[in-house]
Amino acid sequence: MNFIGVVGARKFNDRKAVEDLVVSLPKDSIIVTSGCKGVCTWAKAKAAEKDLEALVFSPDLSNIRSRFEIPKRYYQRNCELIEKCDFVHAFISKEGGYSGGTRFEIEYAVKTRIPAKVHWEGRMDEIIYQRQLPFYPEKQFCAAAWQNFFSQAVAF
């Protein structure tokens, strides 16, 4: 049984791509998604049609004291959703580009070492698996590398 995340931009227009993905999944897959319009609702509907289980994450909007807490609750929901997944499919729209909650979900998947496949609307797909995204500055692990080198040299 695999937990497959299906997330995406509200402005993503290729409903068939989302539905084709859901249809292609093994029967024991569980779709993990949110209740957002577009990609998430299409995935949920197609999962129901194909008798696949769907786990829908919604933000906890109870006990909110100010409107500034609302985005935090949505990002918390996104974290919980991604943490539940074994693999994430993220759909990026041409119009909206790489932004918002979908961007956060992809970055969080990378951070937590959950493999992700990015479906760019009208372009080729990209699989991201435990590596830096191209827009991140490359991290230098110089101190760790030197420490490892010297500890091995001293061991001889």
Predicted feature residues:
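N-terminal intrinsically disordered, low-complexity tails enriched in polar/charged
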Residues: 1-4, 142, 156
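Positively charged, lysine/arginine-rich intrinsically disordered segments
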Residues: 133, 155-156
